[in-house]
């Protein structure tokens, strides 16, 4: 977190605290005034307190956005011994470059998805096993 974001957090907290205290004072004075005066002419929060609250919220949002640190991207294959920790992200891989080797050697990079047991034709496998079993029984006789 940078110095600017810490400063903005502090200023926004002070401004919001002051606007909250001013609002409390206003409502307390309004309550005392309504006990003494039955008409109670002022019931709305003054605009300066509202503007102070909005300014504090805007400063807080700016502090949040300035507190983000620059992301550090790390390559997948690195020999410098860096360990990926929180806040560090791997660089994106261009899929067309990643699959060139797989295409040249004829392997399927999605093999673990395509060749799962749930996609195997069980009836065909049983038929092949029956034919193999019947052929081995015939050879033994």
UniProtKB/Swiss-Prot annotation:
Job description of the protein: Part of the endoplasmic reticulum membrane protein complex (EMC) that enables the energy-independent insertion into endoplasmic reticulum membranes of newly synthesized membrane proteins. Preferentially accommodates proteins with transmembrane domains that are weakly hydrophobic or contain destabilizing features such as charged and aromatic residues. Involved in the cotranslational insertion of multi-pass membrane proteins in which stop-transfer membrane-anchor sequences become ER membrane spanning helices.
SUBUNIT field: Component of the ER membrane protein complex (EMC), which is composed of EMC1, EMC2, EMC3, EMC4, EMC5 and EMC6.
Keyword field: Endoplasmic reticulum, Membrane, Transmembrane, Transmembrane helix
Residue intervals annotated with topology Cytoplasmic: 1-6, 70-141
Record family assignment: Belongs to the membrane magnesium transporter (TC 1.A.67) family.
Lineage of source species: Eukaryota, Fungi, Dikarya, Ascomycota, Saccharomycotina
GO BP field: phospholipid metabolic process; phospholipid transport; protein folding in endoplasmic reticulum; protein insertion into ER membrane by stop-transfer membrane-anchor sequence
InterPro entries attached to this UniProt entry: EMC_subunit, MMgT
Protein name: ER membrane protein complex subunit 5
Localization per record: Endoplasmic reticulum membrane
Side of membrane Lumenal, spans: 28-48
Topology relative to the membrane: Multi-pass membrane protein
Gene Ontology CC entries for this record: EMC complex; endoplasmic reticulum
Superkingdom in the source lineage: Eukaryota
Parts of the chain that traverse the membrane: 7-27, 49-69
Note: Present with 5240 molecules/cell in log phase SD medium.
């Amino acid at each position: 977190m940078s110095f600017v974001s810490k400063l903005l957090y502090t200023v926004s907290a002070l401004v919001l605290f002051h606007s909250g205290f001013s609002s409390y004072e206003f409502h307390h004075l309004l309550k005392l005034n309504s006990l003494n005066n039955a008409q109670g002419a002022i019931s709305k929060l003054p605009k300066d307190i509202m503007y102070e609250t909005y300014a504090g919220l805007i400063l807080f949002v700016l502090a949040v956005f300035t507190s983000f640190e620059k992301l550090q991207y790390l390559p997948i294959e690195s020999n410098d011994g860096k360990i990926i920790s929180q806040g560090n992200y791997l660089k994106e891989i261009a899929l067309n470059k990643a699959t060139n080797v797989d295409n040249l050697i004829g392997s399927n990079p999605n093999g673990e998805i395509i060749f799962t047991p749930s996609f195997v034709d069980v009836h065909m496998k049983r038929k092949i096993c029956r034919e193999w079993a019947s052929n081995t029984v015939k050879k033994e006789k």
